[in-house]
A protein has these predicted regions:
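Conserved small/polar residues in nucleotide/adenosyl-binding loops
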Residues: 167-174
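A composition/biophysics-driven feature that prefers long, compositionally simple stretches
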Residues: 1-166
Length: 178
């Protein structure tokens, strides 16, 4: 935020909020996110979400981390309070028009990618090692499948289902099984 010269950072993409705060939810079927908005300044983090979306221990952890929870829809009134001398960093591609239109016209908007984009994409050493192991395991499984297929084609009946079953068996083997 400081490098960009911003006073406030508005984050609206649900996966980025979940990643940044390390929270999961069930507001959207089959997607572990919480319907929310986040506004960060140099001194505070405001999370706009339904309090019922969180268990007590999560609320306590957020509070301990300095995150203040506000009602989900109150974001629209809050952004109206942005001062004209403030610079607001947000990604217009990921912000709804109602939110942008509620920001005072004399507030300077810095339209840039979310600050979470690069850190989210950066793998730590454990993630890199686990990815390497997964690639090796998958490569061995595919090699075994191709060998099995070449060896057995024409010798035994092979259907799509039996081929998929074989690949699933190989894919679930651990490296020590291989």
């Amino acid at each position: 935020m400081e490098k960009k010269g911003a006073d406030l950072f508005v984050l609206t993409s649900l996966d980025d909020i979940a990643w940044l705060l390390n929270i999961r939810g069930g507001d959207i079927h089959c997607c572990p996110v919480v319907l929310s908005y986040l506004v960060m300044t140099k001194t505070e983090i405001r999370l706009f979400a339904n309090e019922k979306a969180f268990q007590t221990d999560v609320l306590e952890a957020l509070e301990k981390d300095g995150v203040t929870l506000f009602p989900y829809d109150s974001i629209y009134e809050y952004v109206k309070t942005f001062k004209k001398d403030k610079k607001v960093l947000l990604c217009k591609k990921k912000v709804n028009s109602r939110l942008v239109s509620n920001i005072p016209a004399d507030t300077r908007i810095l339209d840039e990618e979310n600050l979470t984009l690069l850190p989210k994409a950066t793998k730590n050493p454990v993630e890199v090692e686990n990815e390497r192991i997964a690639h090796i395991r998958d490569g061995v499984a595919v090699t075994k499948f191709i060998y099995w297929l070449k060896k057995n084609v024409g010798r035994i009946p092979i259907t799509e289902l039996s081929a998929v079953s074989y690949t699933h068996l190989r894919a679930h083997e651990t490296l020590s099984d291989l």
